[in-house]
Amino acid sequence: MNRRERLTRCYSHEELDRPAVYSRTGFPGNDPSYDKLKAYLQEHTELKAGWSGFRETPYPTESYREPYSEDFERHVTILHTPKGDLQCSMMASLKGQPGMAETYFIKTREDAEKYLSLPLPKIHGDASSFFVSVEQIGDDGIVDVSLGMNPAGTVATLLGTDAFAIMSVMDRDVIHDLCQREMNIIMRRLKFILDNKIGPFFSMAGEEYIVPPIHGPIDFHDFNVRYDKPIIDLIHDSGGYIHIHCHGSIKKVFHEFINMGVNVLHPFEAPSMGDITPHEAKELAKGKICLEGNIQINRMYDATPEEIKEETELLIQTVFDDHKGLIVCPTASPYIRGEGEECFPQYKAMIDTVLEWNRRMK
């Protein structure tokens, strides 16, 4: 079974010769300390090449920068809408670290109405690059078509956590209007993609913005399920598969991922980062969802190779008892600048444990 076939069988929930093993690849930019790890992943793990070759007509914006501190500068963006301007700002690192949102486009109901006055963007793009990616990855993996953030996740990034939570109580109708708008945009993206015979592997993220403890199961259903399911249904109707990335406490809403028809769910986090153990996740997912995880990313920097080997073996024993539905994977990309050599032995231990499990079973 080659790597492409193995991942395909994970997504379609068929029996496997061994678990797949994979890592997200959002490495720190221009960091040669990770070159050795990149080469090992390329040679030994199931690969996913990302594709998002569609384009949308941009909205009129202005931006400027201003000094803030030795570590950050402030980036300000002004968005022009038919009903007036909106403004957001973020802190951009001057030292190669992640940025931080400071203020958001939507702060009030009036801001939301301004945003809703924007026309829906037109979708275009060059589909040929997708087929080039498929040819390039060959039997080593799959090409993942990213649909971006889901509707509610996009809205959450427009408002920020606090304003979203407050408006979900005080102006719930506006949240629904915003989610409906974003769903319509994603449906347009998806129809463009499907019309160009692109697929069958798709992904979305953003559901994690509407999970406990900030939001309860009712909000998860109203804002995630309600607007994700039509998208997922269209994917399934085309013969495709959907991968969802959702951190956090998901045990109380796990059944909703099943109801939506999610094919692969990443990650599934035990306390303290989440609230669901591998055993609990497998009991709920068995026969329905492929689980992708779940080695906490900090363990790749803090643990020993022997500890990672033990964690990986226990994960396989717990989740792969039916020989289906497991992609062994850390919870996030390698992310600490300059620490590639430090985490390499732990990644190698995870990967080698999966590969050796297959050899032991023969």
Task: List the model feature ranges, each with a label.
Residues 26-70:
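Segments that shape or occlude catalytic/ligand-binding pockets
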Residues 66-119, 140:
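A contiguous, low-structure linker/loop signature
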Residues 34-43, 87-98, 342, 349:
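Surface-exposed flexible segments
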Residues 28-31, 52-55, 86, 101, ...:
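Compositionally biased, intrinsically disordered low-complexity regions
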Residues 26-27, 37, 93-94, 104-107, ...:
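Short, charged/polar low-complexity linear motifs in solvent-exposed/disordered segments
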Residues 1-28, 80, 112, 116-362:
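Active-site loop segments of alpha/beta catalytic cores
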